[in-house]
């Protein structure tokens, strides 16, 4: 059992969008293979949420900008003595390759938007109980197909997201590893600091404290209020040690 809990909080809109996309893509794979109605609804609901996120912003444009920004940051390390040059070059090539694949890929989510089954299910998801067999006979018969046939279709849907997934995973890994965790101490459940143009806060808390952070702020400044899980009887210590990384 984990003794520490990791919390992440975005400090700008692009990071908020990227974390939501990452979460939804991870959710798509959790219940595979899909063999029943509950698993299917979980899968299609996450597909629908993912398409909604895609429609709200220029996901590809922002990712391409970030891939270029990360390449420039790596270039600045080339002249630093003692740096692993091979590692730097390998990362630069990965960023360059991910950018090339992403820029040449079809519109993100286009295959999913054009799929008839996905479109039919999306229309019914907002209706309470709207995915019953009499409402969605298409889904009902799909769930009675051979497992291999469903698996192949799902694999095709997920493969259409690969250019995005590859670029996003690379970018988020670099951002998450851009700053080390440092020990900090809150006083009376409160902590604040400068953001130093960070994109992401990562915070580690001991599980046995049964506390969680409420974080507000932006890239220049942020504040953290620690709250007890048990809102009635839980206590927040006068001094609380935790680990924080501003990435």
UniProtKB/Swiss-Prot annotation:
List the subcellular locations: Cytoplasm
> Which Gene3D superfamilies does this UniProt record tie to the protein?
YacF-like, YacF-like domains
The answer to whether UniProt assigns keyword Cell cycle to this entry is: yes
InterPro entries, A to Z = ZapD, ZapD_C, ZapD_sf
Q: Which GO terms describe its biological process?
A: division septum assembly; FtsZ-dependent cytokinesis
Q: How does it assemble?
A: Interacts with FtsZ.
> What is this protein's name?
Cell division protein ZapD
Which gene underlies this protein?
Answer: zapD
